[in-house]
Amino acid sequence: FYDTVKGGDYRAREANVYRLAEVSNAIIDQCVAQGVPFAREYGGTLDNRSFGGAQVSRTFYAKGQTGQQLLLGAYSALSRQVNVGTVKLFTRYEMQDVVLVEGRARGIIAKNLVTGKLERFAAHAVVIATGGYGNAYFLSTNAMTCNCTAAISCYRKGAWMANPAYVQIHPTCIPVHGDKQSKLTLMSESLRNDGRIWVPKKLEDAKALQAGTKKGKDIPEADRDYYLERRYPAFGNLVPRDVASRAAKERCDAGFGVNSTGLAVFLDFSDAINRLGKEVVKQKYGNLFDMYEEITNDDPYETPMMIYPALHYSMGGLWVDYELMTSIPGLFAIGEANFSDHGANRLGASALMQGLADGYFVLPYTIQNYLSDQIQVPRFSTDLPEFVEAEKAINARIAKLMNVKGKETVDSIHRKLGHIMCCLLYTSPSPRD
């Protein structure tokens, strides 16, 4: 609880954070029951490790792919419910708008991405679980399908937004390596457990690295500046993400960047390999090392990784109350789509924890408070005027966009606006820079 509140610069809603801490143990039990293969000690007990911003090892993990394994566990449980008929799944649909009837959320309009047709869905309540708005920036680590259209539709209908300026810059991303990229690749936070972050002490060494006449392994140990360990001895390389990102940018702005663009620092595992052995490091991070080598063609066992901060997560989102309902009655927002749990900065692994807590242990109970006085309300017809008007407005907007005779693509406009957003975010003197 304290680490989360402090790591978020005391800007999180403490009641929600306290509840998150209370249900955290139950989250692990739930995931184990779903078959998530968490790492275990030799005796069979669950293993854990430190993540950024916490000085206690309390993060349970599944090698370097915890998020993926949690998704597989959740999808397996969902598929079981689909199979027995308790859940109907609509794949390849995109929400276009939320429908309000007498001021309450009563359904949505969605587009079938296979046929292109709009379809109406009525409900007694609507839950938004569509992630954040990181792709407003260019580049980010978010998948391109995470476009925030659902949350923005709710905002346009009157739902409040909270803390939209709070976005997280993740310190361990693979640097930009071309002008054709649509997104950046995130390297797991777990790498900072054993990897040491450094830049050269001498500016001439940094210039040589940028020119390609030297490699990281050619820099003597005495000439390496482990700047996080130097500045923050209590945390070392496991400082909160915002601190690590600002420190990396400061070193690169000072001219100590280590790649051709000058926008990278080293994440070095040579000390861990010497201390633990290559096989132990491979067992812990092998899949991440393989991914890094496939993207960069550099072997991280032999030469230090290059990393640089990149836009990763949005702490802001739709405003919700303690029961996760937005300012629109009947409209709920969970996970990264809401603002409640992280304040100005999210700790490592807390996004997974919040998503699981909201979905498994909070919303199933709080939504019942809202639905309890709706039990007498009959099922809504999608022929109501509100549904007809919402669909008509969407068709009009689509027709307007399709009839624009411009010469720029949507993607090019997104890139331009995203670059402006990143310029503002990285605190350049002006967007022109």
Predicted feature descriptions by range:
Residues 1-5:
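N-terminal glycine-rich dinucleotide-binding loop that anchors FAD/FMN and/or NAD(P) in oxidoreductases
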Residues 6, 13-16, 30-57, 101-102, ...:
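Glycine- and aromatic-enriched mobile tails/lids
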Residues 10-14, 45-71, 134-138, 267-279:
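Helix-loop-beta segment of a Rossmann-like dinucleotide-binding subdomain
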Residues 15, 61-65, 114, 118, ...:
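Alpha-helix capping and helix-loop boundary segments enriched in small/acidic/polar residues
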Residues 27-117, 129, 173-187, 192:
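Conserved redox-cofactor binding core of oxidoreductases
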Residues 90-91, 96-104, 110-111, 284-338:
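A glycine-rich dinucleotide-binding beta-alpha-beta segment and adjacent secondary-structure elements
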Residues 125-181, 342-365:
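Glycine-rich loop(s) and the adjacent beta-strand/alpha-helix scaffold that form part
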Residues 153, 160-294, 365-368, 423:
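An anion/pyrophosphate-binding glycine-rich loop and adjacent beta-alpha core
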